């Protein structure tokens, strides 16, 4: 449905050239939800704006539903864009128009009949849960309600693709959850292909089928959500996955934690990161028995993404130095990421 081939985007600045996108290729199948994740300034917004040619690529091709947009005339592009809806971090609603009138605007611009507009917009407001707000003005809506209006407006022309540019980043956590649930429902019921960009791995984890990681204008990793969470190949992907966890040491341990052991009875506090099959295997128990070490679990968390389990365990590991080293090597050989957080006295 969406195919980006070797996209490059270079901005000409007064004193230099800025490469925002560098040879980016991405293929999104019909009906998928794909998330592009990256830090601020990584090129996410430029990438999504290249899909509907709000930003024209310096080189490369953009193909949507079999049509190469980069070869279209201006008039042909206007028509092709009707198949591509878009929502933004900021809702861009017209304050002088009601909810109904804001959603109806694309159909009015297409000179649709009043009867069709009435029927279509009524159905869309029902879909996004705003039937009772049809006559309200944007100033009387919450942030989540405004984004629902923007989503309904983006769907008014029956697009095949919906682009979401940081659509939840200005919303509180509860509202974010409701908007993500709505996007998932729209994808399921209407079969719309969704491309979203975000800096939050939690968003990707919750609704995406596919994920691409962007860094300094390059796609550094991509695959299904399950593949990336089970076996992240780049440090950046690993960092984003870790950000979905909220685990910390008890205060008494934090207060006594040192970077190096102060004496022979100072034992390491180790974080073990499990993904895929290593989550279900009793590896810590096996290591304890095999090497004669004692593991006192301080905190642990397991989660799911794309049908794959992943998680962390932090433990105090007691034993002689050789046994602890052998334990770490054994776990790493079994695809467990091992990180020594410090030592307790």
Swiss-Prot record:
Subcellular location(s) of the protein: Cell inner membrane
Chain sites annotated for binding ATP: 38-45
The GO cellular component terms are: Gram-negative-bacterium-type cell wall; plasma membrane
Alphabetized SUPFAM superfamilies for the sequence: ACT-like (SSF55021), P-loop containing nucleoside triphosphate hydrolases (SSF52540)
| Catalytic activity, EC | 7.4.2.11
> What GO molecular-function term can you cite, just one?
ATP binding
Question: Which reaction(s) does its UniProt entry say it catalyses?
Answer: L-methionine(out) + ATP + H2O = L-methionine(in) + ADP + phosphate + H(+); D-methionine(out) + ATP + H2O = D-methionine(in) + ADP + phosphate + H(+)
Q: What class of enzyme is it?
A: translocase
Q: How does it sit in the membrane?
A: Peripheral membrane protein
What keywords is this UniProt entry annotated with?
Amino-acid transport, ATP-binding, Cell inner membrane, Cell membrane, Membrane, Nucleotide-binding, Translocase, Transport
Query: Where's the ABC transporter domain?
Result: 2-241
Question: What protein family is recorded?
Answer: Belongs to the ABC transporter superfamily. Methionine importer (TC 3.A.1.24) family.
Assembly mode: The complex is composed of two ATP-binding proteins (MetN), two transmembrane proteins (MetI) and a solute-binding protein (MetQ).
This molecule's function is given as: Part of the ABC transporter complex MetNIQ involved in methionine import. Responsible for energy coupling to the transport system.
* Record NCBIfam families: ABC_MetN (TIGR02314)
- Name of the featured protein: Methionine import ATP-binding protein MetN
Q: Which organism is it from?
A: Haemophilus influenzae (strain ATCC 51907 / DSM 11121 / KW20 / Rd)
Question: What's the name of its gene?
Answer: metN
